[in-house]
Amino acid sequence: MTDIEALATDNDISREDIPHLFSKLAIGAYERYMQTGSRDDISKAIDSAKQGIDLANDRNPWLTQWLNNLGVFLETRYERTGEMKDLEEAIKVVRQAVESTPNGHPDLAAMLSNLGNEVETRYERTGEMKDLEEAIQIARRAVESTPNDHPGLATWLNNLGVLLANRYERTEGMRDLEEAIQTARRAIEWTPNDHPDLAARLNNLANMLGRRYERMGEMKDLEDSIETARRAVESTPDHHPNLAAWLSNLGNKLESRSERTREMKDLEEAIQAARRAVEATPDGCPDQAAMSNNLGIKLIRRYERTEEMKDLEEAIETGRRAVDSTPDYHPNLAAWLNNVGRFFERLYEQTGKMRDLGEASAYLLQAWSCLHAVPFHRVTAAAKCLELLAIQNRVDQGINLGRKILDLLPSVHTRTLDRNDQQFVISTFAGVASDLCAFLLSTNRLTEALECLEQGRAIILSQLLDDRSDLSSLRHDHLQLANRYQSLVDEVNAPTRQTTPGVVEALLRKRRQEAAAELDMCLKEIRCVPGHERFMLGQTVTEMQECITEGSIVVINITNFRSDAIIISNNSLRTIVLPELSASKARLWHIVAEVSASKTHPSEGLPRVWWIGSGLASSMLFHAAGVHTRGSTENAYCRLISSYTPSIKELAYAQNQAKRAQEVLMAQDTNTMLIAAMPTSPKGPGDEKAPKELPRVE
């Protein structure tokens, strides 16, 4: 018998009242925990709540409220300890409360909101898309079950808007972003001007509008985003703990407008806002590094326009401050180090001192070494470091780093990035492969150079063309293994939210490292599966040569370090150094076609050449190379039959598809042809006689 049950017996308290006493005891312990932070108090709250529920009659009208309270207590302990079982139990008991509450009940929306928040918390922990989907459904139910005059409506609307915005970040579905913006606007409309959450809701809307601007490029969205962020700042008292975050957000939006319009006044105001954000952040605050980092970025923007050394020097100083105030295990440390490395690169460009270039390389290498960071930040830092190592002629270190980057690339995905960042990542991947190829060619490692280049290009294509990727092929053959690989990639790339409680954040960091190790093992397992030995590795040189049925493939690789042509035929592999073709003399690229044509040795007729441009040569028109004056034959048109392919692996894919299509036609044993008459043309005069001529053609 519990103390309360004994007390009830001694004092003639009804047994029906005992659950109420346990509930009061639980609430008291919870309130005491909120004051003291004592783990014993939150555990006492949970134990008391459970005892009261166990003693309650199933028809007790207070049971659903007690279940809901228990869910809140369990989630609170989860935030303290990170114990997943507490979060799972919280979801279970609040779901039970919701299912026991009839539609139209005044407490239903609040319970739905709690359940949605807990499911969202599980999504943040695991990255499981099904949890985000369910959280959105629950939040939508909460809104739909709330009358317009209910004081909680604005909160439920805000929650739904944030969840929809989160799904947009994962899927890039514009319908989600549009609904998120509409919902956030409704939340603000129902929020009084003196409400303590108004600024946070305005800040959310500003971020959503900023996302739509990044996607669509509509200036009105950026203008609305700035005005909304400005309202958030103006609605916040000077000593409010979130003021620095709102100021930083406003500064970012103003910086975006400055980049678009080139208006210096916007950049000046952005710097002022970022500086105020730094000043509003107390020493020791976890956000201190982020605020310093943002200020450094804006100072560099002004330096790039004015070349005032004081801005560059202050940017380096604030960037270093961000790094120094960030613990080694922090997931954003790589981003801060990356920025400081780039600031020192700017200093080297100004001073020409190798010491400054060495500092830049050192910071970038540190960023690469941050194992707790998402792969995106590590790869971008290492790719820039490769460029700087080339300037310093540190070839061996460049090869070592480049190989490690290529090994990490299968762990990076771009789905959670905005379009500008996606394009940046793809170009970064290509740059890594091109630079590594150049380093290897400088040490006469031709086979390895070509295979590394193809590996990088294969990974790029897997990001751009999912239906032709190694992963799509694996899904077809081994769905469960492919899903495990994709799940681990998602987990390794999942960003850590700044609002995540400290203990949970530490567990997420630990889990990210575990997931990275599991991903390495998963890759090894995949490459042991017959037919998938080269998963995310590109082809071997032998495989490349097997797909060349006629002519040659010519790869032109132009980097700041060196330029080369690699010529691959079905029985040979050779390279031609192109000393006259450098990054600074790219206008001389027609030399490439001339040299390559003279080395292809056609047995008869014009040689067939498949062109692949790499590095700075990726957009060059090799088929149009040469002299085109009247009567001249010194050009690619007269010497070659030119085609293009993004990679040799893609050429093999296209050949296999064509072969399969031909086999299907042969199996049908019919000759078919599609003939279309065009009596009208969208951009031409058309031919009214075309339909009459069709029977004769047939």
Each PLM stretch: what is its role?
Residues E5-T9, D47-D54, R95-E99, R140-E144, ...:
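Amphipathic alpha-helical segments of tetratricopeptide repeats
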Residues N11-H20, G37, N57-W66, G82-E83, ...:
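Acidic, Ser/Thr-rich low-complexity linear motifs
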Residues I18, L25, A29-R32, L63, ...:
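Structural register within alpha-helical repeat arrays
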Residues L365-W368, E387-P685, K689:
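Amphipathic alpha-helical protein-protein interaction segments
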Residues I4, A26-A29, A49, G71-L74, ...:
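Non-transmembrane amphipathic alpha-helical segments
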Residues R32, T36-R39, R77, T81-M84, ...:
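Structural motif corresponding to the intra-repeat A-B loop/turn of tetratricopeptide repeats
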